[in-house]
């Protein structure tokens, strides 16, 4: 279905469950272009409202700039003024104070930070310099061809996991997609529990994980 109402209905339920179990939630959104009208729907702004209803506030907002070649003009762009996707919004949400920064090592932060979430200690100095403090993350998107929808690179969830989780920590992914967050968790030494409604995608996720890890997936009967 087109329009924002189906999206709001689905996401409100997802966010309600996520906020029951996750202290920090990293949320990547793409503006909704297929709305049945000339208007778009900025899902990042709608997400902030849905999380606010669950008493979760944004820790940060970043832009994922899909570095690489120029996007092609698909049927939607040719029939409207709606742009081809070149960026997504990435947000991190949390409830009240979860962690505390090291006041001695990062005393200067206290003059500017309005929250007590510390992710800096999990990153190396080089990671902090290259992307830890950046508001725009330039990471190439994965495209099968110039007209295809961009796929999320492993680097994107990997950065979020590095910032907001520790080794052997539990990661929840309600939209597994092609298993990108699962691969990122495998790379960074985290444990991922993921959900995907599409059986075909589940098969792709299993094959992708096996190719990456050289392991053998086991089916567990419920």
Predicted regions span which residues?
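Core catalytic lobe of class I
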Residues: 1-202
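Conserved phosphoryl-transfer catalytic core
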Residues: 210-222
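Alpha-helix capping/termination and helix-coil
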Residues: 165-168, 209, 213
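Short alpha-helix adjacent to the SAM-binding motif of class I
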Residues: 200-211
């Amino acid at each position: 279905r087109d329009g924002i109402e189906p999206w709001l209905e689905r996401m409100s339920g997802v966010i309600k469950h996520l906020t029951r179990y996750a202290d920090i939630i990293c949320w990547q959104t793409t503006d909704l272009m297929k709305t049945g009208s000339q208007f778009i729907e900025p899902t990042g702004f709608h997400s902030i409202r849905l999380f606010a209803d669950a008493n979760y506030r944004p820790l940060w907002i970043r832009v994922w700039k899909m570095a690489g070649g120029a996007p092609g003009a698909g049927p939607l762009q040719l029939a409207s003024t709606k742009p081809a996707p070149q960026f997504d919004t990435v947000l991190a949400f949390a409830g009240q104070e979860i962690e505390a920064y090291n006041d001695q090592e990062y005393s200067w932060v206290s003059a500017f930070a309005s929250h007590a979430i510390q992710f800096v200690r999990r990153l190396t100095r080089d990671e902090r310099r290259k992307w830890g403090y950046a508001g725009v993350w330039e990471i190439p998107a994965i495209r099968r061809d110039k007209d295809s929808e961009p796929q999320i690179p492993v680097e994107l969830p990997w950065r979020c996991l590095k910032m907001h989780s520790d080794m052997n920590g539990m990661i929840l992914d309600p939209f597994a997609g092609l298993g990108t967050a699962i691969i990122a968790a495998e790379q960074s030494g985290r444990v991922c529990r993921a959900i995907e409604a599409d059986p075909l995608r589940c098969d792709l996720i299993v094959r992708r994980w096996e190719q990456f890890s050289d392991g053998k997936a086991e089916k567990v009967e419920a």
